[in-house]
Amino acid sequence: MLLIHGLSSIAGTWWRIGPALAARGWDVSAVDQAGHGGRPVRGEVDAAGLAAAVLAVHPEAPDVLIGHSLGTVAAIGLLEREPGWAGAVILEEPPSRLAPELCLGMAESITADAVTVREDRAGLVARIRRDQPHWADEDVYWAVEGIAEMDPAPFARRLRVLAEEDSVGTPERIVAAEPTPYVLAASSERPLLDGGSALSRADRAELAHRLPAGHLLELDGGHCLHRDAPAAWLAAVAAVLS
């Protein structure tokens, strides 16, 4: 089983999930993506580039591939590069095509956080604790550490490109993937930049219509479901893989 983290995160985000899955009998690996955890960025940070970076450190095809947020982009890139590369695929909070102003806002946010974590780490810790009161201390630690170990520049550039690009929609790429992915989506009504879901209502409805029954699962929580609702996340994944 291979776990791929999201933007501004690192493999440590799976601190609870990885051991819990291992206790259920899975051989679990988690990778740091390009531009995260001290790894360099070579080329673009689009789906193809992210997939190539994953293969550089984990060339073995997994029985199960799980990605969160940016990790779902990498996962889709892996399946577009080699259909059927994984036995089963679970996408936690795959991001919809974002409005231009949201892309630009995220570019500014990740750049500002990279400065804040160097200049006022304690302040950033306090902000995340305030914004995410239900997170475990370890979740807060790894969230901050992920920001500290990220190179925001290539991702900010990519977000600015996406603000002007008319790319293929998320549902189209998910439905075309082989094997057909399972999607875990947050039920939160909050905006994405406030911790809400990255999957739009329109894309969610399209996926519900086009995916096989049982392939779209909604969980109570925000964008980081494996932090917000770890027990429900594990139960959903166990049900999918049983």
Description of each model-found segment:
Residues 101-102, 118-176:
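Conserved alpha/beta-hydrolase catalytic His-Asp/Glu region
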Residues 29-66, 235:
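Active-site loop/oxyanion-hole signature of alpha/beta-hydrolase fold enzymes
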Residues 153-210:
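Conserved serine/cysteine hydrolase catalytic core
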Residues 1-40:
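Conserved HGGG/HGGXW glycine-rich cap/lid loop of the alpha/beta-hydrolase fold
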Residues 8, 32-37, 72, 96, ...:
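Alpha/beta-hydrolase active-site loop signature
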Residues 218-230, 234:
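Catalytic histidine-centered segment of alpha/beta-hydrolase-like enzymes
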Residues 67-71, 75:
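Gly/Ala-rich beta-loop-alpha elbow adjacent to hydrolase catalytic centers
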Residues 80, 85-119:
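Flexible "cap/lid" loop of the alpha/beta hydrolase fold
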